[in-house]
Every structure is written in C-alpha cells, then in structure tokens.
C-alpha cells in the first residue's frame, strides 16, 4: 500500500506538458478544478474527462502510475459512494429491502462524486508527475510575488510547500524500510481487525519520527553550508518565460472553465 502512494514523485520527460511553464500548469490546475466542480451533467463531465485524457496522453505518464496513485483513496471513494447512495433523498429504486433506501438521485450523485474525486486526484497528481520540485517552487513564488508588497515571505512559503511535497516519497520509502525491518523481526502488520493493525503500527512511529527529524536536520545543515538566506538577493539559473504554447494552453483551460460554467447555468 505504501508503494502505491505516488504523490510528490516526479517523472522526468521531454513532452509538451513537461516543457510548459510551471506557472501555466499551476493556473491550469486551478481552472481545471473550477471546471470540475461546476460540472453537473454528462456533457460537462465528458468535456472535463476529454481534457484530462488529452493531458495524460500528451504527458506520456504511464497509466499504471496514475492508477497506482488512486489505490490509497479507494476506501474514501467507496465511503463517498455509499453515503450518497443511501442518504440522498428522492425516488426509491424499488420497494424491496435495501433498495427502498437507494434512490435514483442517490445513484446519480454517487456516480458524479466518484468521478469527481477520481478526476480531481488524477489531475492534481499529473502536476507533480510532470513538474520538478524546483520548478514548482519557482512557479509558486512567481505567481505569489505580488503579495511581497504586503511583506509576506513568499519565497519561504513556496520553499516550505516544495520541501513538504518532496519529502512525502522519502518518508514513504523510509516507512517501508522500517516495516520490512520489523517484519524480519516477527512483526505482523497484515492480520487482525483494523484496530489491531493500527496498534501494530505504533512501534513504527518512533523510528519514523527520528528519521524525519534527522533528514530535516541534514537538509537545514546543507542549506546553511550553501549560505541560504531565503529569497534575499536570490537569482535563478533558468528564468521563467511564457512561450506561445503556454498562452494557448491557458486559453484552452480558460475556455473550458468558462464554457462549463455557462453550460451549468443553461442547464445543459
């Protein structure tokens, strides 16, 4: 299960999606989320799904990486579907046992919510899969740079977010190593009910926290050795510049978001 968590991982490539400016990808993700949460009909969901499919195919990220990233949230997806099935009012499917508690409106709501969660996760994961942590930090800093006038530490905030995102795969790998070492000593993490499994994970927490603090200390030492002083006087080796492709992609996602909002108000 731990190996299925792919959030924060970066898959290098030279595709159009990889070469896009990180600011473009961040803005496109925001527009994509706006479009997704305003989708209410089969037509609008199909439009969002089509755009997501084009992005995935263009990025050449293997489908197994995306589906593997969905495995840890299967329980959340199933819980959401069940809640919508049984607790959405409307016309019952049939007057027979459990079916009397399931409505046609609940079925539609469950399908819509499951699709929304899956497409939301796949769309946001695609951002980290195709954008390196350094590029993501630079993009966030440039997008939020107007807030520097309010004396907000934008560079530090962007750096913190990037480091936190980058440490997710590292901590997952460390947890997997600790669990393997515990299993070699006779620990059992797979048998018993959910409470027994949770109790079995307690011995992992102490070495995991120690490892996390040690890595944080090593990172802080490395940054100090390189005379890191935040964003003060910092320059970039590769200056971010919008290209024609960035404007075209941004325009396409803007049209998608506005178009779906219009279709929503038209009842389509």
Question: Could you tell me what each predicted segment is?
Answer:
Residues 1-44, 48-59, 142-145, 149-152, ...:
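Transmembrane alpha-helix interface motif
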